[in-house]
Design a protein with these regions (language model features):
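Short hydrophobic "helix-edge" motifs at membrane interfaces and signal-peptide entry regions
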Residues: 11-13
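Intrinsically disordered, low-complexity proline/glycine-rich segments
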Residues: 27-30
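Amphipathic alpha-helical repeat scaffolds
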Residues: 16-17
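Small-residue-enriched hydrophobic alpha-helices in membranes
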Residues: 1-8, 32-196
Length: 196
């Protein structure tokens, strides 16, 4: 792997690794998607990077009793080795891929959307999607700590535009065991925040 390729790959590895934290990772989807879109890797390359390089290094964090929840430090030499010669570990993916599958599919979908926009506009779109996701996945009845009036006002127009296509993505990431967060209640909290 050349130094140029390594510089291009590092932000993608880091963003993808956020989907393996032992915390609420669905909030990371817009930021991971932006890094993927900015990288200029095509979908096939991103799929390989995720499953053949990052997944084998990062999945252990979700298999621990108390994994890292702030930031994963992945072995760069191992990532480089996998990038040069690795294959997708099908057995491990089959056994544990479900733990990150929904977030990864959402990341791929949002990556495709963000590619439609110039780099400077992607930042604002990412902020809007982040706000929408944080409000959506906040437990019912909780105040959304990141939805300050200033932050909402900054991205309100974009958030209203994006909500129609981001809501199904968020709904698809709700787990079967999240009965305390019915999809309609989550969506209602977002609509209230957006004033729609």
């Amino acid at each position: 792997m050349t130094q140029e390729e390594l510089l291009k790959r590092r932000p993608v590895w880091e963003a993808m690794s956020d989907l393996f934290l032992d915390t609420e990772t669905r909030w990371a989807v817009p930021h991971a998607a932006r890094r993927c879109a900015d990288s200029l890797y095509d979908d096939e390359a991103l799929e390989r990077i995720f499953w053949a390089e990052v997944f084998p290094e990062a999945i252990e964090n979700l298999l621990q009793v108390a994994g890292d929840w702030g930031m994963l430090t992945l072995s760069e030499p191992a990532l480089i080795k996998r990038a040069n010669h690795g294959t997708i570990p099908w057995l491990t993916r089959r056994a544990h891929g479900w733990m990150v599958q929904d977030s990864w599919l959402a990341t791929r979908q949002v990556t495709a959307w963000l590619r439609e926009f110039p780099l400077d506009e992607r930042v604002q779109r990412t902020k809007a999607l982040d706000l929408l996701g944080r409000r959506y996945f906040e437990p019912p009845g909780n105040a959304c700590l990141v939805a300050s009036p200033e932050r909402v006002a900054e991205v309100l127009t974009i958030a209203r535009e994006e909500w129609a296509r981001y809501e199904p993505v968020c709904r698809a990431m709700l787990g079967d065991d999240e009965t305390s967060m019915p999809a309609e209640g989550c969506a209602a909290a977002v609509r209230k925040m957006l004033g729609i």
